[in-house]
Amino acid sequence: MTKAAAIYQFWSGFDLTAYEENTVPTDAVFPYITYQLVTESFDNEAPVTASLWYRSESWTDINAKTEEISQKISRGGKIIPCDGGVIWLKRGQPFAQSMGDESDNLVKRKYLNITAEFMTAD
């Protein structure tokens, strides 16, 4: 599986539709995840961001999903296999930040900071 496919598979594993940043269709239905696709070569780290997008009066569901993702990555990180090796995902600092949307006060966003270490042949 390519690096891009492995990263997509990871973000798609949370029962939400996952979109690479800037590819969200105009008719996308909340909630969903957007993620930054960054790839590197052997023994290089790269900062990666993702966002959870919900439309709700409450932060309860988005906070629960943020915690689910945090637990999946865990304190020691999450290793995902890909062609030529693995990608080691780790929680960044700060891991999650709450954001709103100026155009719609019901839109809730959690901005996630991740570090991806690429242990791959290329």
Language model: regions and residue ranges:
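Charged, amphipathic alpha-helical segments and their flanking helix caps
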Residues: M1-N22, D27, T34-D122
